[in-house]
Each structure stands twice: as structure tokens, then as C-alpha cells.
A protein has these predicted regions:
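Residue-level preference for short helical/loop micro-motifs built around acidic side chains
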Residues: 5, 20, 46-47
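Short helix-boundary/capping micro-motifs
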Residues: 12-26
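A short LG(V/I)-centered, amphipathic sequence patch enriched
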Residues: 40-48
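The N-cap/first-turn positions of alpha helices
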Residues: 2-5, 29
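Residues in the recognition helix of alpha-helical DNA-binding motifs
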Residues: 35
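Short, basic/aromatic recognition patches that contact phosphate-bearing ligands
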Residues: 9
Length: 48
């Protein structure tokens, strides 16, 4: 489990918006989506 994925999850939850989280973290929106998908696979649950 990557710490950056958890940080991205927290920002998405905070802003309720993948694009805004990506902007704040300095990532592309597609990167945030991939990170959330990785977390979902590791945890075996849908997060959003």
C-alpha cells in the first residue's frame, strides 16, 4: 500500500472531487483515478 495513494484518497474525500484533489496534489486527474483504483483493489472494496 502506497502512502501517496492514501494521501490522494484523503484529498478526494475532503474535496469530494477527483479533479480538485489532483490540482491540489499536483497530479493529473488520471493519476488520482489510478491511485484510488489501486487502493480499492488492495482493500477489496469500492471507496467511491
Amino acid at each position: 500500500m502506497e502512502l501517496r495513494n492514501i494521501k490522494s484518497f484523503i484529498k478526494v474525500a475532503e474535496f469530494e472531487n477527483f479533479s480538485k484533489a489532483a490540482e491540489v496534489l499536483g497530479y493529473a486527474q488520471s493519476t488520482i483515478t489510478l491511485q484510488i483504483q489501486q487502493l480499492e483493489q488492495e482493500l477489496g472494496v469500492n471507496l467511491f
